[in-house]
Amino acid sequence: MPTEGDVLADGQSIVGRSGYVGYMLQKDLLLPYKKIIDNVSLPLLLSGKSKKEARTEAGSHFAQFGLEGTQQQYPAELSGGMRQRAALLRTYLAGDRVALLDEPFSALDTITKSAMHRWYLSVMEEIKLSTIFITHDIDEAVLLSDRILILSGRPGKITHQITIAEPKPRRRDFNLTPEFLDYKKQVIDALGVVL
């Protein structure tokens, strides 16, 4: 619970209310003994839906999240990128207004991470889910964000705010443009990093 201020979604306070924010840690934390359909439908079960209702609702999003054909598989049978997609779907089903993502792509190799970034941007544009994205990767922050908030050390306070004024969906080569490098430099300067 916040010690001061308020948290608003659509102009209404959501402090102490569940179902608005889905949270995803760095690791996918899929349950290894449950099939993918049962892993992603878990938030719906916890919200009171029957197993059948939860599976049906979760299953209706599999194509959108690029998970076709994985419903009956176990997490160990999927690649890292596919497990992250399943975890993101579970997060989306847990909170339908805001997703809080804590470095969801940090464990992925460069090629998979790049593919996931492009996929993530297209899906978030489609489902219109607001996202608070935590990352230590400056390129990732510039590529995925509308706004970058830079925090101080503990206790964390916002020290800088940088608006990324590039339209979405972002151009495929955005990270190779002078504009991208300018945003990246702004972040580096705000962090006080000397290169």
Model-derived features with residue positions:
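Conserved ABC transporter NBD signature motif
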Residues: 2-17, 57
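Short coil-to-helix segment of the ABC ATPase nucleotide-binding domain corresponding to the Q-loop/switch region
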Residues: 34-41
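Conserved ABC ATPase "signature" region
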Residues: 45, 52-70
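Conserved ABC ATPase signature
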Residues: 74-78, 82
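A short, proline-enriched helix->beta-strand linker immediately N-terminal to the Walker B motif
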Residues: 93-97
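Catalytic Walker B motif of ABC-type/P-loop ATPase nucleotide-binding domains
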Residues: 99-102
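Conserved H-loop
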Residues: 128-134
